[in-house]
Amino acid sequence: MGVFFAGFKLLTLRNNVECSVYYPTTTLTDPVNYVPSKRAWLRFHHYLKLSGSKLPSWIFHLGLSFLNYIELPVQFESPIISKEHLALARKFPVILVSHGMACNRNLYTTFAREWASNGYIVFSVDHDEDINLPSGYSAKELKAYRFTQVKKRKEAILRVLDYISNADNIQDFFDNSGIELDLTRVSVVGQSFGGAAAAYTAMADKRINGACILLDPDLESVYEEMKGKSVNLPLLIIRTQSMDASLLRGGDNKEMIFELVMNNRERFKQSMSCSFENASHISQTDLVLHMPREIMMFELMKDVGAVEDYLILNNKLTQTFLDTMLYDKDPSGGFQSIDLVVRKFLTFAKKVKRGTKLIVDKVM
């Protein structure tokens, strides 16, 4: 955690676009309920069915009913800090988040709270798409179906970006606090299917000009559309072996990730694909904190003993990457190398004595 608490507000735009907003605050207020809606958990149950689970929906909802009583560790509608609290009274950098297919806008609060406590404003967009696949579709048709959903996600993300690009909207949303967003440092983050949406959106709109972080991205649905193209931003990809094993095309997703890094030619020295030893796909979400036994039962993670390690190290690596790429400049005024991020992170990992190993992929 940084020097601030994390505030929380809900932003609702036209066409039912909802967004959880996390921001730095110094005021303690009430917490927020973890579950944003019943439909959010329907998506998770549908995902389990696609993964082969035969668990009846009533048992699923009964078993996870305790989540309705869990509260997010954030401060509901607390006032945002003034810009004088920030170093050099700078403007607030922005992070746009696209969640995984079975997830929701509140499921990355561990990350969002970390970033907000360090002075970032995070807009986590909710995507209410149908996870169930149409019957009788060929593999090509299924990929096209998922790509249509990626495009809708891009539209939702850009709708949020349109809104926050208007200074008057920001003043209204933050109660005329006088704060300013730094629209020269707009970053995008996505996990799993949200990683595909984040990368695709970054390529489509140059207003996303900060950094791109992809957490275990599933790139199959956008591969043909992004082939040979570059996000042209500092790029951090944290993948897991469990994701590679779960995809229909197996190891091809890893090759797609490596290709995305290689294509990022102008920012290759600021790009990295990596993983944490034995981490699983779900270890990048808040679920590992709230339901470790259930995760073991659903066989979504082999070892929950290292949950705290994964969360702490994921948070620190992403925070170090953002701060270094957005604010640390080399002697010529350009971006620092990704090597500096790795050195800073390894120094932290050694200091806190976390045993989980960072594996940096050799992308050639």
Residues of each region from the PLM?
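Domain-level recognition of soluble alpha/beta enzyme cores
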Residues: M1-V94, T318
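Active-site machinery of serine-nucleophile hydrolases
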Residues: R39, H46-W58, N106-A139, K269-S273, ...
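Short substrate-entry loop that stabilizes the transition state in hydrolases
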Residues: P73-F92, V97-P134, D244-L247
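The feature captures the conserved acid-bearing segment of alpha/beta-hydrolase catalytic domains
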Residues: L86-A89, N209-H281
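Alpha/beta-hydrolase active-site loop
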Residues: E129-I131, Y137-L183, Y200
